[in-house]
């Protein structure tokens, strides 16, 4: 296997940057910065590079690859200010976003760095994403990447500050949303000596094989009227596919999807986007009205999908096309193949239709997911979710100084840690449009809200209260960390 050291040119304006979430699995829209200028959206887009170890578990493999990162030091209080590490997740990392972490960095006079996840964006070790080249793509290797980079950056910072070798480290705090939120929690679990604490926002720490709770939450968040309208729409879609297949798919600009279940996965994800990212009325108001008026539900739903999911939130049909997902050439859309590999090997999160009262087609079942995994990566691929939960602890991980936050309407909260303890406080942010990463992104979570402002949350006081608790925990843990550092000198 040849290692590709040169970076791959990918020009993508990614929505949440450090916290991008992809469809099918964590469902992150690829363009949520609608009508927001690039300069206001980012704290920095200046690319920096780090030579990362390919295989941290092999003493004999010394291969390296170039890993992209960013730094923002405008608020840093030299020489002993804290360092905030923003973990980039399962997508290209185009810079450091101007969200609520920017507000926290300013408050705590922190420097900020952000590391792109291996294989994603411009941090691809190989020029081919064939299955055999993906064996180094795992959460475990990603955690080692973070540890190695953290050590490298601290040493570089010490040199800049003229601190002698062996001098004390700055206090570090880790941040992440969704999968990167899980990485933030897992990093504190596995490398407690390298961080003073972690914020795990909407952190999916529990790997799940059959994730039926996901759809149950969507139905709950939708409310009875909207749920019934969604269920009727699904039945009409399934019937329409049998009698006028291409005509139905053309309403959604999705005629390229030859496999009907792939199309039904797209239409299910489109509904999820409304609740997960704080825009429930964009879907429910027109759909419920259409049902009451006797209007065509499929046409109404397709209008929502085209006008909002595709035009504003960046939903792309080809990322549901398994022919496209089998493409091993590194492209701007490679993240979808890469995330499916992680789902198919260690994390699962298979969003299957519940047996009763489902808001998605029953064709989206376990067999569908397993067949897709085999179609993309070969017959030997299987999600080892039990091993993942044994290794990290699932939602019962035994760690300290981790803040867990979840939006009340976010279906992914059922894969997070929702019970609170003294060492690992957990907060549910309750409001009508509080979804994925509301504590960092504000409301709605898409399109982008500068500095994650809570003004447009249906109950902003709930968001602000949780944020105040976050500040108090970070302040306490950084203080304890500084005291520990001073006592060790």
Swiss-Prot record:
Molecular function, one GO term? serine-type exopeptidase activity
Asked whether the keyword Hydrolase is assigned, the reply is yes
Membrane-spanning regions, if any? none
Output the Gene Ontology cellular-component terms: extracellular region
Keyword Transferase set for record: no
So which residues are the signal peptide here?
Answer: 1-25
As recorded in UniProt, its EC number(s) are 3.4.-.-
A biological process term (GO) from this entry: megagametogenesis
Q: Which UniProt keywords apply?
A: Glycoprotein, Hydrolase, Protease, Secreted, Serine protease, Signal
Q: Name one Pfam family in it.
A: Peptidase_S28
According to the record, glycans are attached at 35, 51, 162, 253, 293, 365, 406, 419, 456
What positions constitute the catalytic site? Answer: 178 (charge relay system), 410 (charge relay system), 436 (charge relay system)
For the null mutant, the annotation states: No visible phenotype.
Kindly list the places in or outside the cell where this protein is found, as annotated in its UniProt entry.
Secreted
- Please report which protein family the annotation says this sequence is part of: Belongs to the peptidase S28 family.
**What function is annotated for this protein?**
May be involved in a proteolytic pathway controlling the nuclear division phase of megagametogenesis.
Note the PANTHER family from the entry: PROTEASE S28 PRO-X CARBOXYPEPTIDASE-RELATED (PTHR11010), SERINE PROTEASE EDA2-RELATED (PTHR11010:SF90)
This protein is called Probable serine protease EDA2
Ranked from the top, the taxonomy reads: Eukaryota, Viridiplantae, Streptophyta, Embryophyta, Tracheophyta
């Amino acid at each position: 296997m040849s290692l590709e050291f040169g970076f791959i040119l990918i020009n993508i304006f990614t929505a949440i940057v450090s916290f991008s979430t992809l469809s099918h699995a964590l469902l992150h829209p690829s363009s949520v910065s609608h009508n927001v200028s690039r300069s206001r959206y980012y704290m920095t887009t200046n690319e920096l590079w780090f030579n990362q170890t390919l295989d941290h578990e092999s003493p004999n493999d010394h291969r390296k690859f170039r890993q992209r990162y960013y730094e923002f030091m405008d608020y840093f209080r030299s020489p002993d200010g804290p360092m905030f590490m923003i973990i980039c997740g399962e997508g290209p990392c185009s810079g450091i976003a101007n969200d609520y972490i920017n507000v926290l960095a300013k408050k705590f006079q922190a420097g900020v760095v952000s590391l792109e996840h291996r294989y994603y964006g411009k941090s691809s070790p190989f020029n081919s994403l064939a299955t055999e080249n993906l064996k180094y793509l795992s959460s475990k290797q990603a955690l080692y990447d973070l540890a190695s980079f953290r050590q490298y950056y601290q040493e570089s910072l010490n040199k800049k500050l003229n601190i002698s070798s062996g001098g004390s480290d700055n206090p570090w705090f880790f941040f992440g949303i969704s999968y990167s939120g899980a990485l933030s929690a897992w990093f504190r679990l596995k490398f407690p000596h390298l961080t003073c604490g972690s914020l795990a926002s909407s952190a999916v720490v529990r790997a799940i094989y059959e994730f039926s709770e996901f759809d149950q939450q969507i139905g709950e968040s939708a409310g009875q009227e909207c749920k019934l309208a969604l269920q009727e729409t699904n039945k009409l879609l399934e019937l329409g596919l049998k009698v006028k297949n291409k005509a139905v798919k053309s309403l959604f600009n999705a005629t390229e999807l030859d496999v009907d279940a792939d199309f039904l996965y797209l239409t299910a994800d489109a509904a999820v986007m409304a609740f997960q990212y704080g825009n429930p009325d964009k879907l429910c108001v027109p759909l419920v009205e259409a049902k009451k008026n006797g209007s065509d539900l499929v046409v109404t739903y397709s209008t929502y999908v085209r006008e909002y999911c595709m035009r504003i939130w960046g939903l792309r049909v080809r990322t549901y096309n398994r022919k496209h997902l089998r493409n091993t050439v590194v492209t701007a859309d490679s993240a979808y193949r890469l995330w499916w590999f992680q789902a198919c090997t260690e994390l699962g999160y298979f969003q299957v239709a519940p047996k009763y009262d489902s808001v998605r087609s029953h064709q989206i079942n376990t067999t569908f997911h397993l067949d897709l995994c085999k179609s993309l990566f070969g017959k030997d691929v299987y999600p080892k979710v039990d091993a993942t939960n044994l290794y990290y602890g699932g939602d019962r991980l035994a760690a300290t100084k981790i803040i867990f936050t979840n939006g009340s309407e976010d279906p992914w909260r059922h894969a997070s840690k929702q019970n609170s303890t003294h060492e690992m406080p957990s907060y549910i942010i309750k409001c009508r449009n509080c979804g994925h990463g509301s504590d960092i992104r504000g409301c709605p979570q898409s399109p982008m809200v500068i500095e994650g402002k809570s003004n447009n949350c249906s109950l902003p006081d709930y968001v602000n209260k949780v944020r105040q608790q976050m500040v108090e925990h970070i302040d306490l843990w950084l203080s304890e960390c500084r005291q520990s550092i001073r006592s060790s000198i």
